[in-house]
Amino acid sequence: MKTLLLTLVVVTIVCLDLGYTLKCHNTQLPFIYKTCPEGKNLCFKATLKKFPLKFPVKRGCADNCPKNSALLKYVCCSTEKCN
């Protein structure tokens, strides 16, 4: 009986497909974050290139790493709250 119950629990978990959701910071403050929507598997952080202090000006989730611009340098990562 216990084996049957355990099997049902495992099958339920597999069928639910609990899926992995990435959490990324989304403000300049390092303790505020959001869960990324499906398909957004990267966190990014943008800093000003010409400014001596490299504090982030923009953070969030992305499906692809944004390209650097004349003003902003982007750094991407794929682990929890890595930006």
Swiss-Prot record:
One term of GO molecular function: toxin activity
Signal peptide: 1-21
UniProt keyword annotations, A-Z: Disulfide bond, Membrane, Secreted, Signal, Target cell membrane, Target membrane, Toxin
Role, per record: Has low cytotoxic activity.
Tissue: Expressed by the venom gland.
Gene3D superfamilies linked to this entry: CD59
Family: Belongs to the three-finger toxin family. Short-chain subfamily. Orphan group XV sub-subfamily.
Disulphide connectivity of cysteines: C24-C43, C36-C61, C65-C76, C77-C82
Name of the protein: Cardiotoxin 7a
Coarse class of the protein's main subcellular location: secreted
GO cellular component: extracellular region; membrane; other organism cell membrane
InterPro entries from the UniProt entry: Cytotoxin_Cobra, Snake_3FTx, Snake_toxin-like_sf, Snake_toxin_con_site, Toxin_cobra-type
Subcellular location: Secreted; Target cell membrane
Organism: Naja atra (Chinese cobra)
